[in-house]
């Protein structure tokens, strides 16, 4: 049986590190901090971690707690332009870069970043 992406990169520990590093940047980012209520950063962090773990072959906790991901629907209330997308991607690239190459080799790193780029582009819902 082929190993899942989730298991290949270290499972929950790796996703927790990526998401934690991402959310550590949010309060300091002038664009992103407007999108995330300060009183729910921990909740947002948990939801993103659970989503990514499930997407990449880990536990299905996200769906069991929140239902189908429906990313576009869940992000529709937020005005997301290329500016917000690029800020999100900048912080996510920094978070992914913080994971050592032994844990996240080049092939898996590229696959993860390609997905994150695609997802971020698909969530843009406003031209300006």
UniProtKB/Swiss-Prot annotation:
Cofactor dependency = heme
Signal sequence range: none
The UniProt note on the cofactor reads as follows: Binds 1 heme group per subunit.
Modification after translation (UniProt): Contains L-DOPA (3',4'-dihydroxyphenylalanine).
Q: Which domain of life is it from?
A: Bacteria
Q: Which residues are annotated with the PTM 3',4'-dihydroxyphenylalanine?
A: 36
Q: Which SUPFAM superfamilies match?
A: Globin-like
Keyword Heme, does the record have it? Answer: yes
Q: Which Gene3D superfamilies does the UniProt record give?
A: Globins (1.10.490.10)
Keywords in alphabetical order: Heme, Hydroxylation, Iron, Metal-binding, Oxygen transport, Transport
- Oligomeric and partner information: Homododecamer.
Q: Which family does it belong to?
A: Belongs to the truncated hemoglobin family. Group II subfamily.
Q: What is this protein called?
A: Group 2 truncated hemoglobin GlbO
Q: Which gene encodes it?
A: glbO
């Amino acid at each position: 049986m082929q190993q899942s992406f989730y298991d290949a990169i270290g499972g929950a520990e790796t996703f927790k590190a990526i998401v934690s590093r991402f959310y550590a940047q949010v309060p300091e980012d002038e664009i992103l901090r407007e999108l995330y209520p300060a009183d729910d950063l921990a909740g947002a962090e948990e939801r993103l971690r659970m989503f990514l773990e499930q997407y990449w072959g880990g536990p299905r906790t996200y769906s069991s707690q929140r239902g189908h991901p429906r990313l576009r629907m869940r992000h529709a209330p937020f005005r997301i332009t290329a500016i917000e997308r690029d800020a999100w991607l900048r912080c996510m690239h920094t978070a992914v870069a913080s994971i050592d190459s032994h844990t996240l080799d080049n092939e898996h790193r590229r696959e993860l970043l390609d997905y994150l780029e695609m997802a971020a582009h698909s969530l843009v819902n406003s031209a300006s």
